[in-house]
Amino acid sequence: MFEGQPKGLWALALANTGERFGYYTMLAVFILFLQANFGWTSGTAGTVYSSFLACVYFLPIIGGAAADKWGYSKMVTIGIFVMFLGYLLLSLPMGADIPAIVVMVAALLLVSLGTGLFKGNLQVMVGDLYNDPKYAQKRDAGFSLFYMLINVGAMFAPTAAIKIMDWAQLSLGISKSDSYHFAFAVACVSLIVSIAIYYLFKSTFAHVLTTDKAAVEKNTKELEEMAPAETKERIVCLCLVFAVVIFFWMAFHQNGATLTYFARDFVATSATGVTAMEMDVTNLVACIFIVYSLCGIFQNKGKGKIIPAVLIVAAVAYLSYNYMNVTEVEISAPIFQQFNPCFVIALTPVSIGIFGWLAKKGKEPKAPVKIGLGMIVASIAYLLMTTTTMALPAPDAVNPKHLADVNPNLLVTTYLILTFAELLLSPIGISFVTKVAPTKYKGIMMGLWFGATAVGNFLVSIPTMLWGNEHYVVWGTLMCICLVAALFIFSIIKKLNKVS
């Protein structure tokens, strides 16, 4: 899985990991901060949250166009510094009056702009690593690994947010509403780490940088010119995929919206036994070690199996010790956001292994089929939520209160299913864009991928506005949206497979 990948992949992935750690630390508590600090309703907080996400994913369109003109590396560097300024403003406690709202909006715009310059362009650079015929067959696996490392940062983010807030409240006597700003400050530190990694290991991916406009024009002329009809066909197919992506992200990013509301209002606030262990990120890391070590045993021969076997024994011993000493733990709503990235990391080698095995047999489904399957799997997650919450009382959207003690594993299972969907759609979709997009439109096409994600994230607010209705209304709506999107993509699958 890790062998035969270009060295630049690891440098770019780790630089992105640092940035994503900060972003998800902020995002883990953001919607709760809006309600705690400003006293807004679930619908209002959800609208602000989804509008921010929309900006984060819309501005890569501008970032992609700028990179096509001035170069990817320059835009990535500028993006990191702009994001840093945004997170710095968010980390300042300003109260809850009009000036505080103005500063928050300015900070969110800076974070969005910086992300727009950074995120998409970094991923285009990753795609360009695989233009070398030596690595061409490893493109999908490479993007899956890239996506996995992003989630390393995301997995630790909720715990970091909760721990830093608890420390601020207990050790410094900071109020809960002001302690959120300490979580936002973590993002500033993570960006310093990110830019350091980017420049320290720049030599590993320097050959894909297009900072010289003259060089870009020269290389473009040297490339075989694609026929206008083929260019049009590829762009149309990409736009059709973008249309489906909108509805996936609308459903998926409920993890920071209605699913977080559900965790706060309906999930048990404490746990014991195995469930309590699930809430500790170190136990999740031990489980990940077991998965990767099992993969190592299957892949290696002879003495190569010894180290993975030792790691499995050590991880099992660690988990056994923790189980014998586990006590009741309190459950905070943001902690559930650690499960999706944990599952991404754990399941990535499984996903790569399955599709690698199918590829050897000549039966690996093409990217559009994987995307359609991802939408079906996402609908199953919300089918689970629909059927298991029918007996619960309707939530209070205006004055949030704890109304039930649902088993936390309902949400854990939902996140697991959504992760299966994500692995089928997100890294595969990004790989599809870098493969299918005409060379001279790569930057703008990657930007449009994020633009579609932006629209989906803006639509995240619709279920938050439904919050307050019966549960089957909220979750059933999301289930139906995913199913319709799946039917659409399978109805045009021949057209999409043609350009794959």
What are these regions (language model features)?
Residues 1-6, 131-140, 162-328, 351, ...:
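Intracellular loop-helix junctions on the cytosolic face of multi-pass helical membrane proteins
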Residues 17, 86, 99-121, 394-424:
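Hydrophobic core of transmembrane alpha-helices in multi-pass small-molecule transporters
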Residues 68-83, 137, 299-308, 357-376:
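Cytoplasmic membrane-interface "Motif A"-like loop-to-helix N-cap segments
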Residues 3-53, 252-262, 317-329:
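Helix-loop boundary and gating motifs at the non-cytosolic
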Residues 79-99, 316-326, 356, 373-403:
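C-terminal ends and interior cores of transmembrane alpha-helices
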Residues 47-68, 155, 338-355:
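Central cavity-lining transmembrane alpha-helices of secondary-active solute carriers
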Residues 105, 178-200, 373, 472-494:
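Symmetry-related core transmembrane helices of the 12-TM Major Facilitator Superfamily/SLC fold
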Residues 56, 138-169, 183-194, 281-282, ...:
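Glycine-rich segments within core transmembrane alpha-helices of 12-TM secondary carriers
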